[in-house]
């Protein structure tokens, strides 16, 4: 796969940690030049440093994906840094602990939808024209198993991930004939810092999460990264 991707340019949002960091590192290991984007400057720069220490090439651009001007500047920054954009992994997202639907509040709804839905829409809105101008590209959006079904106390998050899948399908249909492939990955529970913080206080929750999966364990960030690179190849 590295021969297929080598020399190309990838943008990874939410690249400061977790799935985003692992995917940025996987792209770099395959010879791809990587633009890492995140609100967390320290984490994003840490990802870039790890890539460079491993012999890869990367730059960091701070970006709030909920703001149109910042996303526009991010994509322009990709073109300025490397001249093109071949792959985009729109991974930035949040999950706020929720109660039942009727107990939710407007602030939670707005925050989740702004990052998880508007953020993905804005990223594709600005990535697609650049890809069209260069003759094609590949986009992968991070959805979730929550976007394929439902679970208690996750109504807003589930709605946001259903929306990501809808955006992905629509973009895929609209731009396939123009050489742009658009797909989504739908992770279940993944072993990230966020997961560990959520379950460290109650090991029983971690055991329950592992038992939900046919493999008997939660997923690994490297497994999602491999799926993203496959979809880009």
Predicted regions and their residues:
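Alpha-helical segment proximal to the catalytic Tyr-Lys
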Residues: 129, 173-177
């Amino acid at each position: 796969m590295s021969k297929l991707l080598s020399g190309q340019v990838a943008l990874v949002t939410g690249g400061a940690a977790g799935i985003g960091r692992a995917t940025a590192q996987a792209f770099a290991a395959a010879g791809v030049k990587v633009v890492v984007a995140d609100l967390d400057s320290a984490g994003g720069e840490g990802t870039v440093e790890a890539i460079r220490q491993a012999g890869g090439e990367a730059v960091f651009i701070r970006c709030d994906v909920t703001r149109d001007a910042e996303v526009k500047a991010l994509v322009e920054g990709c073109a300025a840094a490397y001249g093109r954009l071949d792959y985009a992994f729109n991974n930035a997202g949040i999950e706020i602990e929720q109660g039942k639907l009727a107990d939710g509040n407007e602030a939670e709804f707005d925050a989740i939808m702004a990052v998880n839905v508007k953020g993905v829409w804005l990223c594709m809105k600005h990535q697609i024209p650049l890809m069209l101008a260069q003759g094609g590209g590949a986009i992968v959006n991070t959805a979730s198993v929550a976007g394929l079904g439902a679970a208690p106390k996750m109504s807003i998050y589930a709605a946001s991930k259903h929306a990501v899948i809808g955006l992905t399908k629509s973009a895929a249909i609209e731009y396939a004939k123009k050489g742009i492939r658009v797909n989504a990955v739908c992770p279940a529970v993944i072993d990230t810092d966020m997961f560990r913080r959520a379950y460290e206080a109650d090991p029983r929750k971690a055991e329950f999460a592992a038992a939900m999966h046919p493999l008997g364990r939660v997923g690994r960030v490297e497994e999602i990264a491999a799926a993203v690179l496959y979809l880009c190849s």
